Amino acid sequence: METKAIVVGVGPRAGLGGALCERLAREGLHVFVAGRTPEKVEALVAAIRNAGGRATGVAMDTTREQDVIALFDRAETDGEGVLDLVIYNAGNAAMGQLHDMEASFFEQVWRVGCLGGFLVGREAVRRMLPRGRGTVLFTGATASLRGKPNTTAFAAAKAGLRSLAQSMARAYGPQGIHVGHVVIDGGIAGDKIIKGIPQFAQAMGEDGLVSLTGLTDAYWYLYRQPKAAWTHELDLRPFKESF
């Protein structure tokens, strides 16, 4: 019987979502790749299958309740096996000063960063509770812990997601569901930074960004933890990062 995983918030292949999908597939899980852009989703699915892994692509909007429910319904009914791991990786690190900010901007950042996490977390728990086991992991950021002048909307969303994860862990941990929150305290060495803002990537250097391999190792470590020694929150940063 196969083990299934859902990764929500998959963008470029050389990003955290893509790296997580490829790592889980290499470990033998059937990965449901969920993202907004069909072309990126299908390209990643093809790469996983070409490497001998199992993957199913689902283009969806994590802020739409019906999309999230449909994703979980498909994961449960597509193939044999059980859904054992769900990762919520969606987020929009949009910057802006409060006095110039439209309410619609703040709401959209919150919807992706927090509301989507609620919808995904709720559906994961609903499907896992009858079995009394499963793992739900949320991707956090520096802004999960503290707000800065230009992170008003992003920090509010990420702090909300962190509180959601804490509430879920305390409510459902005793029922066998492991809920974890990963604080990524630094830039990620993926396409969004390396190709999107190359000057910043060059200034930080290879040792100044969090490696994708290191991140996927950490998520896999959390997933494989025994019940007698669960971690709820894990923070990761390059050794050069001040904190």
What are these regions, as identified by a protein language model?
Residues 2-3, 53-54, 81-83, 97, ...:
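Active-site loop of short-chain dehydrogenase/reductase
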Residues 9-11, 135-160, 165-166, 170-173, ...:
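Catalytic loop of short-chain dehydrogenase/reductase
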Residues 39, 59-71, 103:
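The beta1-alpha1 cofactor-binding region of Rossmann-like NAD(H)/NADP(H)-dependent oxidoreductases
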Residues 121-122, 166:
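A short, exposed helix-loop element centered on a Lys and neighboring polar residues
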Residues 174-186, 199-243:
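C-terminal helical subdomain
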Residues 68, 97-98, 105-107:
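Substrate-binding pocket helix/loop in short-chain dehydrogenase/reductase
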Residues 1-32:
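Canonical Rossmann dinucleotide-binding motif of NAD(H)/NADP(H)-dependent dehydrogenases/reductases
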